[in-house]
Amino acid sequence: MSNSEVSPAAVAVVTGANSGIGRATALHLAEHGYAVYGTVRSIDRAGKLLAEAETRGLTIELAELDIASGESVREGFEDILDRAGRIDHLINNAGVGGNGAVEETSAKRYLDVMNIDLCGATRCIQAVLPGMRERRSGTIVNITSVAGRLAAVAQAPYVAAKWALEGVSEQLALEVAGFGVRVAIVEPGITQSSIFGKNVDMPNETGAYGPANERMLQMYAAGAANATPAVEVGEVIRHAIETDDPKLRYPVSWGGA
């Protein structure tokens, strides 16, 4: 069966499904016949996702896990595998922003962002890959950013983590191609997502980078006015899963495509 012939039993796991790109992607895939498992850090906070799914007559299963914790990821994916039997597609969406100039960003700050945006995705990959290799099929979609290709002003931790995830994704694609596993990198620009509301802290310890920080805030404002609906990213993700002519990279959204 070609990837474009989606079985109703195809199981897709979307991390960070509670909001933004993750929520839109989970709903979009469910609408197109996938058995969707959305991961959230707290099921108690998944009300909007579940309410929208109910309104649209869709079913989305939830799994509680925190990608920052190896133990949480192991337990969460064991739970999904117990319920679903297998995982066909992993969409690594969960992540955080991270602002700061190189001079003013501590090693701890870099590591904190890397632990989520890079290591969190890697933990999830390691949880699903043995089964995919054994079945010789599957897709891993890593959501990076336009900031994974082009440096952004005053976003050193975020840029570092996303560039690293791009490199790991390229490496992974080479490693797993022989097992019939596909890897795709989706690179959103500015998209309608809660990450911007959460990512407003602008360290300026020396006072030297105030203008750079201001430019970043201006870019956020322009992005908020022109942001691409998150479902458009979900559509690209589904295309990356289903296409018979796959690419490694898929830029999308305002400022990205």
Regions found by a protein language model. Give the residues of each.
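The beta1-alpha1 cofactor-binding region of Rossmann-like NAD(H)/NADP(H)-dependent oxidoreductases
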Residues: 65-75, 107
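SDR active-site lid
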Residues: 177-248
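Active-site helix of classical SDR
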Residues: 125, 161
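Substrate-binding pocket helix/loop in short-chain dehydrogenase/reductase
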Residues: 101-102, 109-111
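Conserved glycine-rich cofactor-binding loop
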Residues: 18-19
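Conserved glycine-rich Rossmann-like NAD(P)H-binding loop of the short-chain dehydrogenase/reductase
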Residues: 32-48
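Residue(s) in the substrate-gating loop at a strand-loop-helix junction
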Residues: 145
